Amino acid sequence: MIDRRALLASALALAACEKNASAAPAIAPTPLTSIAPFPIGTSALTGQFEDRAWVDLCLTHTSQLTPEWEMKMEYILSETGEYRWDAPDRIAEFCTTHGLRLFGTTLIWYSQDSAFFRSLDPQRFRTEYDRYIQTVAQRYRGRATGWDVVNEAVAEDGNGLRSCLWSEALGQDGYIARAFEQAKLADPDAVLFLNDYNLENLPTKGATFLRLVERLLKAGVPIGGIGTQSHLDIEIPAGQTAAFFREAARFGLPIHVSELDASLRAEARFDTRSQRQRIEQQTARVAELTSAFMDLPPAQRFAFTVWGLRDTDSWLRRDARDDGKDSPLLFDAAGRANPMFGAVAEAIRAG
């Protein structure tokens, strides 16, 4: 996965600039919240709250917000161990004001730790690890309906678990179990998720992830839900996404499609497919994902979150390789529904 840390550096400024963009009026499609029997979510940066068009689109089509970056450790915890609450609190207040669910991400992630932990002795490390999780989760207790407690624990290729600062100090299963235990103490009512990516795209990784879930549950770890980011590769075989969802459903846990997008970018140098052909692949894969989610028992459909509203809000559009033409989300820059929106809506209606 591309490192989103570098890409997010300019995101807040970009969001603020977009509020001044002019766009032709669009015919508004039926709001997804009016047809979906589950919460529809999106990601948010506080700069987007100043963009009236973004706010209107958000309040029309979504019922849940996930902070894109400003509730991660890299933002909250300084190198000296001080906590910063301005942006996370503002997102929580926005949700309260507008009647949206708040979903927190992420308490522990290999990619965005804090330099604060790197100089600690083992005992202090454990103490501060517990303190961080409890401090953040307790602050939003009663407001956050759920948390990505641990994000991206499985190795990139799916062969085993990822080595990171947390696993080196607390063990590969140990840091995960400890994080869930501390989060449960901090907020017993929140749904606690193990979240990862490429679970549909790479069957090996999906299988490793589900074995991890099974192992932790057998050990008594209080995992309350399964999160699949669903950054979909539009070229995966038909049926592969549905197969993963069938396997994941066997635990009976709530499942969160937590970061959906589907890039149209041609990765192969000599890819000769037309844009229309790529859109057909995209909508087919997104429709399959939505149908697989709809096939879950109602109690297991936690939420369906798209990682951004407009194409220009996407982290993929902040990538240096972006040509300004990728369309990975439900709406274009002007807030008009993309074909991907229709794929989601039609799959929901089909039940």
Q: At which residue positions do the language-model features occur?
A:
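Conserved, mostly hydrophobic/aromatic
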Residues: 65, 95, 147, 226, ...
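Glycoside hydrolase catalytic-domain groove-lining segments
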Residues: 173-178, 185, 189-191, 206-211, ...
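N-terminal substrate-binding region of glycoside hydrolase catalytic domains
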Residues: 34-89, 94, 101, 106-120
